[in-house]
């Protein structure tokens, strides 16, 4: 007999499965719905010591969590070039390197290895900087607790932080094997597995409240050390992702190719006048037969739930850490925020 969780997963999958064509977009960890969903879960899990405005801002944080992928739009050439490396780190290209807590020192070390930094990526640095950006904004809030502009800024920055943290928790964002096992020249065969994994939070049904129950939320004494530890744990799951690939492809097989358009018929002799032709037979009414989607294997459901919980826990811990560390920030003497109009 199937475990009740497996039954729930299989039954709800028939309702929630999405067309495979939706996966034909550039790689972005967890997709739009997934990034927003896990960011909001992290905010809702925060303890009371985090300010009320922030705990009430889950929706806005989720909306902002999508922004970093918008910044990679192909029409924004300069912004795309700067933003794209912020979303990944191909760890194999820097094996054995001790990562400094400075993106430019890191870039210099990568260049010493005669590797293009754009191929490596700087995901841990985009996340570290996002944490520090939120920390400073929380420090502003401590000084100007009624300033709604600062509160809204904190929610936006929190969304960006959640995006980069979510990318780090997607194992294929940490590896040269990001879309199929890398070819000998380290290029990607682009097999489509990246899109399958990115869609898990969106396409696999699970009980979010149950998955995030008693979510562990830490205060990290050293954010940089914590980021590297989380990066290592995520990277260690790359092989597991590839072990799950057959199950994912069973759940979401490739969409069938559209039927070829028939060639126009060769003109024939003129038809007889309408009044000399017999009336056509009534057209048969086609019967629509819904093809049920294949079930989602329990192995994929379990992996999705584990990743969602780990990601929400990591994001919430970074939020709590940013709040705690903001207490030690001294705002510069030149900073004067205008008071809101009465």
Can you name each region flagged by the protein language model?
Residues 1-14:
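Bacterial N-terminal signal peptides that target proteins for export
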Residues 16-17, 22, 27:
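Cleavable N-terminal signal peptides
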């Amino acid at each position: 007999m199937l475990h009740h969780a497996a039954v729930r997963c299989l039954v709800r999958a028939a309702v929630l499965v999405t067309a495979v064509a939706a996966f034909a977009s550039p790689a972005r960890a967890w997709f739009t719905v997934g990034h927003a969903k896990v960011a909001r879960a992290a905010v809702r899990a925060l303890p009371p010591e985090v300010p009320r405005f922030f705990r009430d801002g889950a929706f806005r944080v989720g909306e902002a969590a999508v922004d970093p992928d918008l910044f990679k739009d192909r029409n924004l050439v300069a912004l795309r070039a700067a933003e794209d490396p912020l979303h990944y780190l191909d760890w194999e290209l820097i094996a054995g390197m001790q990562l400094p807590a400075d993106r430019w020192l890191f870039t210099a070390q990568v260049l010493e290895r005669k590797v293009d930094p754009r191929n490596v990526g700087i995901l841990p640095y985009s996340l570290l900087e996002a944490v520090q950006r939120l920390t400073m904004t929380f420090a502003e809030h401590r000084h100007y607790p009624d300033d709604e502009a600062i509160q809204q800024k904190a929610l936006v920055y929190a969304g960006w932080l959640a995006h980069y943290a979510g990318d780090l928790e997607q194992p294929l964002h940490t590896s040269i094997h990001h879309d199929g096992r890398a070819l000998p020249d380290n290029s990607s065969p682009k097999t489509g597995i990246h899109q399958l994994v990115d869609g898990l939070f969106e396409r696999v049904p699970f009980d979010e409240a149950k998955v995030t129950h008693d979510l562990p939320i830490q205060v990290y004494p050293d954010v940089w050390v914590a980021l590297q530890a989380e990066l290592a744990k995520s990277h260690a799951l790359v092989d597991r992702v590839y072990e799950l690939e057959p199950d994912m492809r069973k759940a979401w097989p490739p969409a069938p190719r559209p039927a070829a358009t028939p060639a126009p018929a060769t003109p024939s002799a003129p038809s007889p006048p309408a009044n000399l032709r017999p009336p056509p037979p009534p057209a048969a009414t086609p019967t629509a037969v819904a093809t049920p989607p294949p079930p989602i294997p329990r192995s994929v459901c379990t992996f999705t739930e584990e990743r969602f919980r780990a990601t929400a826990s990591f994001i919430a811990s970074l939020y709590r850490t940013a709040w705690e560390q903001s207490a030690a920030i001294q705002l510069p003497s030149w900073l004067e925020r205008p008071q809101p109009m009465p």
